[in-house]
Swiss-Prot record:
SUPFAM superfamilies in alphabetical order: LuxS/MPP-like metallohydrolase
Lineage of the species this protein comes from: Eukaryota, Fungi, Dikarya, Ascomycota, Saccharomycotina
Protein's name according to its UniProt entry: Presequence protease, mitochondrial
Alphabetized PANTHER family for the sequence: PRESEQUENCE PROTEASE, PRESEQUENCE PROTEASE, MITOCHONDRIAL
Residues involved in Zn(2+) binding: H84, H88, E185
Organism the protein comes from: Kluyveromyces lactis (strain ATCC 8585 / CBS 2359 / DSM 70799 / NBRC 1267 / NRRL Y-1140 / WM37) (Yeast)
Catalytic residues identified in the record: E87 (proton acceptor), E160
Its EC number(s): 3.4.24.-
Amino acid sequence: MFQIRNYATKYAQSRALRKYPVGGVFHGYEVKRLLPVPELKLTAVDLLHNQTGSQHLHIDRDDNNNVFSIGFKTNPPDSTGVPHILEHTTLCGSHKYPVRDPFFKMLNRSLANFMNAMTGHDYTFYPFATTNETDFANLRDVYLDATLNPLLNQQDFLQEGWRLEHTKVDDPNSDIGFKGVVYNEMKGQVSNANYYFWIKFQESYYPSLNNSGGDPTKMTDLQYEDLISFHRNNYHPSNAKTFTYGNFDLNNTLQRLNKEYQGYGRRGSKKRELLPIQMKEDVSVETEGQVDPMLPPDKQIKTSVTWICGKPEDTYQTFLLKILGNLLLDGHSSPFYQKLIESGLAYDFSVNTGVESQTAANFITIGVQGCDEVDSIYEVINKVWEEVLQNPFEESRIQAIIQQLELSKKDQRADFGLQLLYSVLPGWVNKTDPFDSLLFDETLERFQEDWATKGDNLFKDLIKEFVISKPVFKFTMKGSETFSQKLDAEEQERLERKLKLLDEEDKKVIFERGKQLQELQDLKEDLSCLPSLQISAIPRVSKTYPLLEKDNVLNRITDTNGITYVRGKRLLNHHIPRELYPFLPLYADSLTNLGTSTEEFSTIEEQIKLHTGGVSTRVSVNPDAQTGKPMLLFQVDGWALNSKTDHIFKFWKKLLCETDFHKHKEKLKVLIRSLASSNTASVAETGHAFARNFGAAHLSVTKAINESLNGIEQLQLINKLSQCLDDEALFEKEVVSKLVELQSYINGSSDMKFMITSDSQVQIDAVHQQITGFLSSLPKDSKPCDFYSENYSMLENPGKPTLLQFPFQVHYTAKCYPGVSYTHPDGAKLQILSNMLTHKYLHREIREKGGAYGGGATYSALDGTFSFYSYRDPHALNSLSTFDSVPEFILNKSSWGEPDLNEAKLSVFQQVDSPMSAKNEGTILFHYDVTDEMKQRRREQLLDVNLNDIHQVAEEYLKQDKSIASIVGPEIPNFDALVQTV
């Protein structure tokens, strides 16, 4: 088996070498270099377009999940967000595809498993991934025309960037305010305290980068002419870097690129190198930011210290810096973690902590959040550097890092091509040779040789060169109670300055322009110019991953590259008392953070890294696929080389049975502080998911349990627990005793099931024996309990929308309706309906008109919840009104036809048929009890949905008296009175 696979890999590489000889010219592209990388089973081909100087990197690999990207070096000239707004507006129509928003319209005319456009620090790129060759050609053409020949209409700039517009577009007497998709997106970003700290740090330390995403306080200075100029100066083939990955014929792409580049000449690069501030002495900057409501009032400081450390172009030195960063910061045995976090000086590391190599300079930052003053932090940081120079790193820690690097190389991912693109592009646009980034084995071998001869001096030399006695940059942000009010006041003052400059004619123009934009948004377009796959591209028969079951163990034999993955689960439905449910996530987290009566977790963690790819514990709740009843599961996972799987079970046994909650109370406090410090930021990033989960908890027992485990309720619990850390008696009673009690309920071999994924029957049989030994080491039965998960209470329906307040600048909304189980025939109809509503109605109403960054409908096939949502939304109540209008729109105003239905099916199957890594094959049966027969039946149901079905389920399920609405975000004045009208 291995010999055949290795031969196939070598054959593919030799074929690539023959196909693209160095010096060969293909459609205007000259092959400059080739690089076989056998350890990653790929061959890299470096090509140059002779006419324009455009560079192309092709990764030839036997993988049918093919990737294309076109990217540009886009140094932001200021902080108005012009690279980001241009990224949006290029996708709003082009010369070959002159329709509004071809990007979003291609989302449901394709089977791509990934489509996006992204703005980095100093580059912008447009990637997609698909397994269908026709689809690949379609999307490549749309992307190329969008980037090189966009229409860049002023209306699209106003919609996507920013504009002045009446709050009620059809009322000239209503207030005028700022609107715009990117404007509200970045207001939402600023609401994330971690992002705000990071971007203000960047602006202070690396001001030449500016803010490519856009600072809302500066974005309203951007003019349409600036956008046109930025595109003209940057979106040129000479400044383009294109990338392909996979097994599709490269010649087709080169031919298409060469055709697109005709008429362009070669431009010299005028891009200046962007570097951090040059320091001859220490620099300190202090500013203010958000107060985190989940942290104590006296722990509202974030601070960091930064050193510049050479350039990413030196890829080996950059590799060493990352190893050093890992040794210093990663895990329980790292010195900075022990001295800054474990000591209680701070709650957690700050978001900018670590080695940064994404720009033209490397730098290392040590920072914390959740502290009460900075001097002691700086003192400890300096002391740790001194101690590191005096005390050698343990050999076992180095070997653990090498082991993790080796395993990460062997661990196969379905999105390997995209991950490769993300890893090479930031350096590639900043003069780092992408081939150097691919030399995995060569770099690792050099490191092992250097470590063997130089030992600790390898890292001490780096520290002496870049850190000791070198100028440092200190950045501090203190939480201010008035911060949000100041942001609101700044926006209002900026708006008033704009309004004062308007005369009556200007106001008339604004009013007419707003109406014209809305008319344009409502216009039904002819989309026949856009390419589309046909429904026939979707196979009617689902791909299956054969599994064999023996003794409560599911077995999957597949190509795992010499790795074995083991999963275990125990059904807890009748094992856990109701009052302990909220403590289950903390219990699971504690097992991989505390330690035992005889070992510190730092020692255990090091052994885990030495012998496995990792072990984890978690709790989840899933609905039964047929009945919808909750399945509360405690899960353990682990993976290792085939020869080391016995270690997985040793660690499981140690964590499950020997974790000592009493002895490691202080570590438990550290864990709770860390969880509390990240809670608000997680809501700022995914507030719509929290709103949706909270709403669904009123409709389903499964979702009510999930709200307790993963929702706002869980955040509130962690916040409450973080406030009792200084009261030993209370902490013992409210936290430690409950976790000890959970241990007695969870540990038991009854109701345990497993899944093994490996590459041979011999290995499967060996792991079966290890499972038998593991089960015999556990108590047969855990402590009895008479509470059943089915009896868990749903949240009580409040009868009106609920506002969950957080100190953000925008809102996140959700409206939820009960659906059906996975096997119910109406589930497929509801899933297609949700997709049609997103693309044919809500995208226009919520995003284009309303200015929210995102919005739509979604139907969860597994948990049976239908929901509407909006994301980073400036008009939450308007969005709820739009959700309420959906039934009337479907029944009276929609004019959907078969093409609309087919597009929705294509969009749904993008995820249904998305590529899967070997380790995840068949796991839907293990995690959700969804059989191949159920999957096939649902597939047929999805393909067979008709327009009558859509109207039937809309009328039956989208009833107001069954819905629950929720909003996450800042206070809404007169909320109770206003929601009566929603």
